[in-house]
């Protein structure tokens, strides 16, 4: 990757992330090169293909790094973060509306432009179907996961 292609993040965001890693050491796993590349790709994709989107929900948000990267590219975007793990949600609540709930049980309270599911590899087909069938009609959706079966809690591949 040439220096001109390196994503640029502002100082406050980097400080926020490092505070997060100090408070939550497992947050460091959100910063593997493959994680950052997939998140910056997705944020660029949203900016290019859904420029009019105003409110999105990120399912499997974990510590909100994807939300932060999207916010860098689309500053007016309202982002709602959902994760079943309450520990990371406490961190994301510092910056975004956040809820600790299983994604297939989430209740939509108002319209959203798009939903993003970043943890499909952690869901059984039954859970995935329940989540997918709950998405309001006319809502864009993005699925992003991985095919790393070396992780014990990965039950499916994308």
Residue ranges and their predicted role:
Residues 51-63:
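Conserved class I S-adenosyl-L-methionine
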Residues 1-51, 84-110:
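S-adenosyl-L-methionine
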Residues 63-74:
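Conserved SAM-binding loop of SAM-dependent methyltransferases across substrates and taxa
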Residues 51-54, 76, 111-112, 136-138:
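A general structural motif
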Residues 124-158:
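C-terminal substrate-binding/active-site "lid" region of AdoMet-derived donor-dependent transferases
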Residues 112-126:
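A short SAM/SAH-binding and catalytic strip from SAM-dependent methyltransferases
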């Amino acid at each position: 990757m040439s220096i001109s292609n390196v994503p640029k993040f502002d100082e406050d965001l980097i400080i926020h992330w490092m505070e997060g890693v100090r408070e939550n050491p497992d947050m460091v796993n959100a910063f593997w090169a493959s994680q950052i590349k997939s998140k910056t790709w997705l944020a660029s994709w949203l900016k290019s293909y859904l420029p009019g989107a105003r409110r999105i929900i990120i399912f499997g948000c974990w510590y909100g790094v994807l939300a932060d990267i999207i916010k860098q590219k689309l500053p007016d975007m309202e982002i709602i973060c959902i994760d079943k793990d309450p520990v990371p949600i406490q961190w994301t609540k510092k910056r975004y509306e956040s809820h600790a709930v299983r994604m297939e049980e989430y209740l939509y309270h108002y319209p959203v432009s798009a939903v993003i599911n970043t943890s499909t590899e952690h869901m059984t087909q039954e859970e995935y179907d329940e989540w997918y069938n709950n998405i309001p009609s006319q809502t864009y959706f993005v699925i992003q996961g991985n095919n790393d079966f070396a992780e014990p809690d990965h039950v499916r591949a994308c």
